[in-house]
Amino acid sequence: MKRILILGGGFAGLECCLKLESYFQNNPEIELTLVSEDNFILFTPMLPQVASGTIETRHIVTPIRTLIKKTKFYEGKIKYIDPHGKSVTLYGTNENRGMLIHYDFLVVALGSQTNFFGMKDVEENSYKMNTINDAIILRNRIIDLMEQAENETDPILRKALLKIVV
């Protein structure tokens, strides 16, 4: 039995998993495992629509377990990758705390992080758009600015409150 472990349940990790499921669908000698911090896939290109309130968050998430057929799935956070011992330790959630997963082949598809290139002012005065929570925070801030502008009598201050840079 060969064990393929995929770390990351975003676009790359899930697509890799689905392709491997399809390729090895009739091969009982292959065991696929997917680990992700979330139990859902988030369609991040639609986060601006969530922030603007034009769609609801439920429209851009799909449970991972509904998409995979042959793959074991674990929701958890990676604590340690041991390339020599061919194992990954998870912090995990619920009953899977401290779990150790062995593999023969490892796919690392852990996504990306926003890089502000050391520009602290940009980092402190901008909004990231990576998660549903990020979109909700931005939406709430825009609503707050619009409420403030609605009640502002000074036209210069009102204009400043409504100035948003994208």
Predicted regions and their residues:
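Beta1-alpha1 glycine-rich phosphate/pyrophosphate-binding loop at the start
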Residues: 1-75, 80, 161-166
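FAD-binding core/adjacent interface of flavoenzyme oxidoreductases
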Residues: 71-165
